[in-house]
Curated annotation (Swiss-Prot):
InterPro entries listed in its UniProt record: Aldolase_TIM, TIM_sf, TrioseP_Isoase_bac/euk, Triosephosphate_isomerase, Triosephosphate_isomerase_AS
Binding site for substrate: 10, 12
Database matches in Gene3D superfamilies: Aldolase class I
Localization in the cell: Cytoplasm
Catalytic activity of the protein: D-glyceraldehyde 3-phosphate = dihydroxyacetone phosphate
Residues of the active site: 94, 167
The protein's name: Triosephosphate isomerase
Keywords assigned by UniProt, alphabetized: Cytoplasm, Gluconeogenesis, Glycolysis, Isomerase
Subunit structure of this chain's protein: Homodimer.
Domain of life of the source: Eukaryota
One GO CC term on file: cytosol
Protein biosynthesis listed as a keyword: no
Length: 250
């Protein structure tokens, strides 16, 4: 089954008003694949500005949200605030949230449920550390993360609002990249897990992105893999290289 290409950007704690202006002006003028879904995650303080500046067809995502709608949670952002900025997407469970800020599978699952219940589309992230890969635990780690996500998707219909991102933690910001074959291997076992534990039809439809040091030079080879449906791009999503990645299937 051919699934529509999805290219996600994740600016992390980067960007500025001037960068948004320059970047989106470049993107506006570029010849990009009209058949690709493009969603760019930006810091919370720039959500509204980026949403207003984004070229037509490009969606803006928050990089995180909390599991409840409001309250005494200093520094957090709610789903309603994200929607108030005009945004429809949120990235959840990124490896930096898991390993720097200590977010558990349980908490990420709760965030997924709340975001979906609030009407947002979600990009939940999964992936293993280098030590876990070397210990042969890649599948176990990813399956545990998927279980926490899947049991918090409230209905089969809600899966239409879910795009999974596989990010091998050992390949993020390190310059190391999983080979196309390594990426395909994990994407396939994750899809097979969804087929077994959720639904065969959902497994065929849900898009699974690769998110480990994607660059203009490796995107095309990664994108040829049958179970790699796009990318979640970090550093390269801040640069003109992002245009080449968007055009990976051309």
């Amino acid at each position: 089954m051919t699934r529509k290409l999805f290219v996600g950007g994740n600016w992390k704690m980067n960007g500025s008003y001037s960068h948004i202006n320059t970047f989106f002006d470049t993107l506006q003028k570029a010849d990009t694949d009209p058949n690709a879904d493009i969603v760019i995650g930006v810091p919370a303080c720039y959500l509204k500005y980026a949403q207003d500046k984004a070229p037509k067809g490009i969606k803006i995502a928050a990089e995180n949200c909390y599991k409840v709608g409001s309250g005494a949670f200093t520094g957090e952002i709610s789903t309603e605030m994200i929607k108030d900025c005009g945004c429809e997407w949120v990235i959840l469970g990124h490896s930096e949230r898991r390993h720097i800020f200590g977010e558990s599978n349980e908490l990420i699952g709760e965030k997924v449920k709340h975001a979906l219940d609030s009407g947002l589309n979600v990009i939940p992230c999964i992936g293993e550390l280098l030590s876990e890969r070397e210990a042969g635990k890649t599948n176990d780690v990813c399956f545990a993360q998927m279980d926490a996500i899947a049991k918090n998707v409230p209905s089969k219909e809600a899966w239409d609002k879910v795009v999974i991102a596989y990010e091998p933690v050992w390949a993020i910001g390190t310059g190391k990249t999983a080979t196309p074959a390594q990426a395909q291997e994990v994407h396939k076992v994750v899809r097979d897990w969804i087929r077994k534990h959720v639904d065969a039809g959902i497994a065929d439809k849900v898009r699974i992105l690769y998110g480990g040091s994607v660059t203009a030079s490796n995107a095309k080879d990664l994108g040829t893999q049958p179970d790699v449906d796009g990318f979640l791009v970090g550093g390269a999503s801040l640069k003109p290289d992002f245009i080449t990645i968007i055009n990976a299937r051309r």
